[in-house]
Regions:
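Catalytic binding pocket for nucleotide-activated donors in carbohydrate/polymer assembly enzymes
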Residues: 268-361
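Juxtamembrane luminal stem/stalk of type II transmembrane Golgi/ER carbohydrate-processing enzymes
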Residues: 1-263, 352-354, 361, 365-413
Length: 413
């Protein structure tokens, strides 16, 4: 019966194309109600942002040293800076600012293999905060409560790529009152504090645009995934990486004809996603990955396997309507779960995914475009206004401990 369902589903579902870019697909559906309104909000006129002018050693010189950072999945911190410099929400008068932004590239320290090294990030962030606190009065009047920082690393402002170490470190103490804009999102986790704005990782829009295929291409792949199932170098026994969820996908479905899964990463990866109905988005070392962005952009229904994940712009994007959540413990039943979804439900998810505004919200295009991820971040900041009077400290009042945290973080940067 499952095979029959898939054949019927292919006939009915396969004709839905991508609809990304020109937005000419007829098979689209707007999100109903307030979610659709929020996604299409225009933040201009609703907030003003003051950008601190920092020495170039905190941003531009770091990028000049390693331009690879522009294409890394953590590049949102760079492009957000560039966007704000020319954004109409920018104000040169700090007295009228609603928010203060510190342009600091804490993830642009890459190994020869392109992996980020966050070990200097806490000292770098601390140095920048000391600078703005010494040269402007605005940090001290709130201790950062009207400031936001982009921290797109694996575990945000915990600044470590290993979860156990990140949990042990916790969020940098000086950022406890600030609003954090971060890719990491997991409920009840020490590296996600209340009030943070969860954003998508950076995926190069031009690169994806270059791999678009005809919108009427049939979706002949039922389930698609490319990536690691085991991380033998860092988790030789195989039970810790992805909490075993990826290993369970491989062991249960490597020989299942409905599942096109492999560790190979072909040159047709983006094209294959456009030929697939479902794209697996399992957790890895962190719960998020660029696959989520790619799936939405290419109209492939994201199958989210990451317990307690907090997804990007969850107050604007109706993830339950466009995706499928599968608990990590239910991975062995993945085939039954997906083949049991009614075809009309799949068709509606595809129509929603075909809506250009849905795709736009996941991207950081150059130049910026209305409704993109930059604007969704601003919308999130605007919705926090006006600031409550409690963010402003009384004369002489202090809440942050400048000597808290690991001893190594206190060394000069």
């Amino acid at each position: 019966m499952r095979t029959l369902w898939w054949v019927l589903g292919f006939v009915l579902v396969g004709g839905f194309g991508l609809g990304y870019g020109a937005g000419k697909s007829l098979h689209t559906e707007r999100i109903s109600g307030s979610a659709g309104d929020v996604l299409e909000d225009d933040p201009v006129g609703r907030l003003k942002v003051f950008i601190y002018e920092l020495p170039s050693k905190y941003n531009k010189k770091i990028l000049q040293k390693d331009p690879r950072c522009l294409n890394h999945m953590f590049a949102a911190e760079i492009f957000m800076h560039r966007f704000l410099l020319s954004s109409p929400v920018r104000t040169l008068n700090p007295e009228e600012a609603d928010w203060f932004y510190t342009p600091i590239y804490t993830t642009c320290d890459l190994t020869p293999n392109g992996l980020p090294l966050p070990f200097k990030s806490p000292r770098m962030m601390r140095s920048a905060i000391q600078l703005i606190a010494s040269n402007w009065p605005y940090w001290n009047r709130t201790e950062g409560a009207d400031h936001f920082f982009v921290v797109p690393h694996d575990f945000g402002a915990c600044f470590h790529y290993q979860e156990e170490k990140a949990i042990e470190r916790g969020i940098l103490p000086l950022l406890q009152r600030a609003t954090l804009v971060q890719t990491f999102g997991q409920r009840n986790h020490v590296c996600l504090k209340d009030g943070s704005i969860t954003i998508p990782p950076y995926a190069p829009p031009q690169k994806m645009q270059a791999h678009l295929i005809a919108q009427d291409t049939p979706r002949s792949i039922f389930v698609y995934f490319r990536g690691l199932f085991y991380d033998v170098n860092n988790d030789p026994e195989g039970g810790y990486y992805a909490r075993g969820a990826r290993a369970a996908v491989w062991e249960n479905f490597k020989d299942n004809p409905l599942f096109d899964i492999s560790t190979d990463h072909p040159t047709t990866y983006y094209e294959d996603m456009q030929r697939a109905i479902f794209c697996l988005c399992p957790l890895g070392w962190a719960p998020w990955s660029p696959r989520l962005v790619e799936a939405v952009v290419f109209g492939c229904i994201p199958v989210i396997i990451a317990d307690d994940i907090v997804l990007p712009f969850a107050d604007a994007i109706p993830w339950e309507e466009i995706g499928v959540y599968v608990a990590e413990a239910d991975v062995p039943n993945l085939d039954t779960i997906l083949t049991s979804i009614p075809i009309d439900v799949i068709l509606r998810k595809q129509r929603l995914l075909a809506n250009p505004s849905m795709k736009q919200a996941m991207l950081f295009p150059q130049p910026a475009q209305s409704g993109d991820a930059f604007h969704q971040i601003l919308n999130g900041l605007a919705r926090k206004l006006p600031h409550d009077n409690s963010v402003f400290l009384k004369p002489g009042e202090k809440m942050l401990n400048w000597t808290a945290g690991p001893v190594g973080d206190l060394k000069p940067w």
